[in-house]
From Swiss-Prot:
Listed name of the protein: Protein OPG049
Domain of life: Viruses
InterPro entries xrefs: Ig-like_dom_sf, Ig-like_fold, Poxvirus_F5/I6_dom
Chain segments annotated as transmembrane: 286-306
Keywords: Glycoprotein, Host cell membrane, Host membrane, Membrane, Signal, Transmembrane, Transmembrane helix
Length: 321
């Protein structure tokens, strides 16, 4: 009995402080209406004001895909197992009773998780020089019962920045013996940035010098994420080198290649022309020779006929005399 009273007090206190109930990843949550199920005609369930399911006396339909394997929905309850960070939000059940009355049940859920967003962006780049800005942001974290404010560190062994979390946003609750955060998390202030420069031809003796780490420390736990900033520069240098190689070929080389290609194409066309038209040209010559020969024969025949005709006329003229 005493445990239940404390639990109810904790829930009410959290609702009063942050308007939500905090859960850890993989917890189970039950959102239920206290209306007698026999009085309910149907219930519509919402997640962040979007309908996710409709429950009737006969069936429930309309589950969204991310909930299918982890949710159980009925007329009176929405149960989610194995909570994920992205399950955070506002859940609402609107029950339509058989007498026309509408009953609404709402719960704001905040799922605590340790999430670090560590990114690198090139600010300045030449063929030999590269400057990268590394940014680390804590997008979510679980304090796990810590009684001291957390803090974050970004950098390498030799170069780093430190940031304590503001206690105004992360308050210590004596009854709970731990720090709590609001909903949504005021993560806009939980970020660090640091810049680093790299020379392309510098010999790297220790790979850890280029590894940037972002840590979140608390009283009894920590978690971190790592990023090799030099790899970002090397990728940009490789892309720059590829672009240089692609554009370094002189125009004359391109023109020469084009000329050679054109010459080869012309030679091929000439060969094709010769192959296509050499036979017709020989036939024409043969026809001309035949025509000349026939004309010569005809001319000879005409001359012979003329000679015979002249000979006969001469003979007849001699007889008459």
């Amino acid at each position: 009995m005493g445990t239940n009273v404390v639990r109810v007090f904790v829930i009410l206190y959290l609702l009063a402080v942050c308007g939500c109930i905090e859960y850890d990843v993989d917890d189970n949550v039950h959102i239920c209406t206290h209306t007698d199920v026999s009085h309910i005609n149907h219930t519509s369930w919402y997640y962040n004001d979007k309908v996710i399911a409709l429950a009737t006396e006969d069936k429930t339909s309309g589950y969204i895909s991310s909930f299918i394997k982890r949710v159980n929905i009925s007329l009176t309850c929405l149960n989610i197992s194995s909570l994920r960070y992205e399950d955070s939000g506002t859940y609402k059940g609107v029950s339509h009773l058989k007498d026309g009355v509408i009953v609404t049940t709402t719960m704001n859920i905040s799922v605590k998780a340790n999430i670090i967003d560590l990114t690198g962006r090139v600010r300045y780049l030449t063929r030999n020089y590269c400057e990268v800005k590394i940014r680390c942001e804590i997008t979510s974290f679980a304090l796990n019962g810590s009684t001291t404010p957390p803090h974050m560190i970004l950098g390498t062994v030799d170069k780093w920045k430190y940031l304590p979390f503001p206690t105004d946003d992360y308050r210590y609750v004596g009854e709970l013996k731990r720090y709590i955060s609001g909903n949504p998390y005021p993560t806009e202030s939980l970020a660090l940035e640091i810049s680093s420069t790299f020379n392309r031809f510098t010999i790297v003796k220790n790979l850890n010098d280029d590894e940037f780490s972002c840590y979140l420390f608390s009283q009894n736990y920590s978690f971190h994420k790592m990023l090799n900033a030099r790899h970002i520069c090397e990728s940009e240098w490789k892309a720059l080198n590829n672009n240089d190689n692609a554009s370094s070929m002189p125009a004359s080389h391109n023109n020469l290649a084009n000329d050679l290609s054109s010459m080869m194409s012309q030679l091929q066309n000439d060969n094709d022309d010769n192959n296509d038209y050499s036979a017709p040209m020989n036939v024409d010559n043969l026809i001309m020779i035949v025509l000349i020969t026939m004309l010569s024969i005809i001319l000879v025949i005409i001359v012979v006929i003329a000679a015979i005709s002249m000979y006969k006329k001469s003979k007849y003229r001699h007889i008459d005399n």
